[in-house]
Amino acid sequence: MRPGNPEALSLPYDPSRIEPERYAFWEKLGVFQPRPDLAAAPKGTGAALQPVPPGGGAPFVMPPKGTGAKAPFVIAIPPPNVTGSLTMGHVLGESIRDTIVRWQRMEGRETLYIPGMDHAGIATQNVVEKKLRAEKKSRHDLGRDAFLKTVWEWKEQYGGLIFQQERRLGTTPDWTRERFTLDEQYSHAVLTVFKKLYDEGLIYRGRYIVNWCPRCRTALSDEEVEMVETDGHLWHIKYPLKDREGHLTVATTRPETMLGDTGVAVSPKDPRYTGLVGQFAVLPLVRREIPIVADDMVDPKFGTGAVKVTPAHDPNDFQTGRRHGLPEIVVMDEDGKMNDAAGDFRGLDRFEARTRIVAALQDAGYLEKVEPHRHNVGHCSRCNTVIEPYLSWQWFVKMAPLAAPAIEAAKKGKVKMFPARWKKVYLHWLENIRDWCISRQLWWGHRIPVWYRGEEMVVSLDAPEGDGWTQDEDVLDTWFSSWLWPFATLGWPDDTADLKRYYPNSLMVTGSDIIFFWVARMIMAGYHFMGEAPFAHVYFTSIVRDAQGRKMSKSLGNSPDPLAMMQKYGADSVRFCMVQTPTGQDLRFDEKALESGKFFANKLWNATKLVNMRMGGEDLSGVKESQLRLTLADRWILSRFANAVKDVTRNLKTYRFAESAQAVYHFAWNEYCDWYLEMAKPRWALADLGDAMTDEQKADLRTARWVSWKVLDGILRLLHPFMPFVTEELWQSLPHDGETLAHAAWPKAKKSWFDAASEKEVSFLQGVVVAVRNLRVESKIAPGKPVPVFVRGEASQLDLLEKLASQITPLARIEKLTVSRDGSRPPVAASAVVEGAEIFLPLDGLIDLDEERARLAREAEKLLTDLEGVKKKLRNQDFLAKAKPEIVAKENERLVQLEETLDKLKRAQQSLSSVRE
């Protein structure tokens, strides 16, 4: 047992002082590194954190019997962009992840918390190119090698800022294992995967329609496109028929692409156009003859029922064109400007071209009408530019074969998602999955390992032998590297010791916004390359919104600076606020919640100072529980502590972080600080007797000290995963075992401490004290003025009150407590009812009788309302038919209690009425 350092609490609670000091303390001790000495788990037991199902069940998947080992607990940080800085969304995720990691560490598990960063191809290249533009330069001015050198220099100077911020939050990854997706080892894994998939026939190159960002000048995956509802127009354009009178009217939202039309499509079921199928129309402005084809993709109810077919600029038209053998004419360049195929409109920006083309159609008499039209328009998720469906050569992954085991994993429960509703979203996407475009027209990233020489093509991690080979200019999608995160961070493709020990991971905690980008793909990669799921569970964090319910964003300016919040309130307060997000619900962030967290930390600070002071330096390490003289208050707080341990642990196991945090908060503040410490004060005061204490008094004092310290120690352990800094500081001030609270054992709910009888008795005591306090306030009697109290009730209640009198009188400032066994009561008194017992506070000469009558009238009115509500419920046949029998029984019990209480209240009203007479 190490002696505490109570002098550390001599200064007021100041998180800005203690938090940096404590983080440095943990790092120096090596707290964040995994400790294989804690357990030696066999392979395959890493996926260990299993929530308890409703009704109970084994909380963990433990190693096989006979191993005597606990499985390692492994979790990875979703790698933030190298350009990133801490947001409230990051704070939420990191607070939850670190809470779990710290808890598992205290449970005696070997924990590995893997940090790392994503090179973030588009985002990082955009940042550096913006810097170059400010210098009147472009990446092309520098050339590829010089540009990449500039990006690496930028990364070394500015990258990783977010990890410094996460340290401030108190997160505990093993920083010695920090990974970067462009590290040499990780890059080797990425390129190895490309070659493996290519050799298996799952990667191919083709000329297809892709999502193209003219600003970033690269292809985007479907998941990188954000659909924005936009007010646009529907232009109705006349397409003259060839060699006959008349025309077809075509409706389009994108007239600028009509220059690339190579057909007009109608529904084969549309009788209006049956005679025109196989004929030709003449493309306005261009005068190109284009066929009229019948295709099932046409909705006869949309627009005119005839649609233009532009195979090079629309994904649906691309498929239609392939079915009918239509030419594919690209009319734009990669920067969104019209090319030579656009004729007179060449060189114009696509939106300027739209305006000019509509004007030309109007002038030539081809424009029939224009209608307002609200529709979804794709935008680049990185720069918010309107994307362009664009025909180009790209590399793709065939996803259907990879998706099959990932679908089965979710359906059979091998991978579980929390909240469970995300399973349906996940399965819908996988069951309708499209091939993944993985090539990007960037320079920053993993360059595609494909080499060309004339007509030859070689897929190789290294340049082929011989001269004349050139490497593919494109790089791989950033997500093509991050989908390997659970095993590439452990050394794959090499068969490393880390990979054997720590794969699969135990849990993934991430945002639901990347369920497709990342989570689903990680599961696919895990099964394909490792033969098993990368983790057993996925917990999806909530969206952080402001007090008005708006999603936090830079554009709205409604996202607070997390560092400023931590400086003002402390990282502990920020963490404690964030983890109280109800599972499956968005978090409405309110700064007042941070104030509450700081008040709580300060409450614990002062309580610990008090306990330290009252312990008087006594060494309690050798005290055995059997030697103690436990009072009712002691038995009650130990029982409540055992229940708190059970509640906090159960809720952590089931990912109910809010309920877990609230359980320890309620116990620490409302029960330990507000009640037990007050009840212990009379025994603490025995120390003032010094040598005059009797042996019994010494035992009473030692017991009060031991229980106060033991329960406070347990509170700090329960709270440590949520509020690590202040709990470590307070724990170090108390006598303790070990060097750090971070490695202290998680509390256990000791069976012998559960004491329902003591809890029931103290509940009655609390009810009486609260009732007397409330009567004082309502009767406007000074808080410090001792008052007499009379109690009338059942014999068992009166016996208990006499037994508890020494506890009740100081807590309620009672001058004299009188139990009325003959049914008498003061003639003029304020009254309350506690569990059927009547509490009377004599008022003769102390209060205004009219005010007391008004108070009783208000209480009676409330009771009548409650009584009518219960009666109405019990008259409801639907309720009686559907409710469980025990629920109906409780309502009947409540009815009886309300009627009895109302009857006693009426008698009190009659008593006051008789006084006036």
Q: For each of these PLM feature ranges, what is it?
A:
Residues 1-49, 53-54, 59-85, 105, ...:
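Non-catalytic terminal extensions that flank enzyme cores
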Residues 102-110, 131-144, 164, 168-173, ...:
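Secondary-structure transition/capping motifs at alpha-helix termini
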Residues 236, 428-480, 484, 528-571, ...:
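Feature 926 captures the class I aminoacyl-tRNA synthetase adenylation module centered on the KMSKS loop
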Residues 68-128, 181, 190, 250-253, ...:
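N-terminal catalytic cores of NTP/NDP-binding nucleotidyl/phosphoryl-transfer enzymes
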Residues 90-92, 315-320, 482, 516, ...:
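Alpha-helical support elements that line or immediately flank enzyme active sites
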Residues 110, 255-335, 362, 812-815, ...:
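Catalytic alpha/beta core of large soluble enzyme barrels
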Residues 2, 12, 21, 28-29, ...:
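Residue patterns forming the tRNA-binding/recognition surfaces of aminoacyl-tRNA synthetases
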Residues 288-293, 473-503, 670, 674-677:
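Active-site-adjacent "gating/activation" loops or surface patches in catalytic cores
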